[in-house]
Amino acid sequence: MALLKKINTQVNRIMKNSSLVQNICFDRVPLFIPRLSLTVKYCLAVKLLIYLLYCWYIYSEVPSASSKFRSFTFGCVVVYHNKFFPRFIRTHSINSIRTFSKFQVIILFSIEKVTRSESKNHSYSKTDISDLHQGYNNPPSRFISQ
């Protein structure tokens, strides 16, 4: 975990020096920016990987969560690729995540929600699963890309 924190710190430093970050507040970046530099894209990819490794670290403590985590991880990767590399996945329905910041919040909220649920009763409830996916299964129509 210490290594992940060091990598995350370096990535944050690179992103702070980027002209994109200087000119645009990151929580207001639109879904698709053609001029988004490759450096920023790769930094965001590394940050996503860090969060997924963190998810894996937490879920590995809970045996019953492994299959749910695999599908959740795949969903995260699809959302990420659809947001920053839309030429790969143009028609996927998961277009609703408008910003990387919101995406991070969804991941962290999901980790907390499932971990709390597992520690209480060691099983999933339908409510917890629907909470995990409500961010991109029921998108506000104004957030869906054209």
From Swiss-Prot:
Look up the domain of life of the source. Answer: Eukaryota
Q: Tell me the membrane topology, using the record's own terms.
A: Single-pass membrane protein
**Pfam families according to UniProt:** Pombe_5TM
Localization recorded for this chain is: Cytoplasm; Nucleus membrane
An example Gene Ontology CC term for this record: nuclear membrane
Extract the InterPro entries matched here: 5TM-prot_SCHPO
Which UniProt keyword terms apply here? Cytoplasm, Membrane, Nucleus, Transmembrane, Transmembrane helix
UniProt entry tagged with the keyword Transferase: no
**Per the UniProt record, which residue ranges are transmembrane?**
38-60
The entry's family comment says: Belongs to the UPF0742 family.
**Full protein name:** UPF0742 protein C1348.03
Organism phylogeny: Eukaryota, Fungi, Dikarya, Ascomycota, Taphrinomycotina
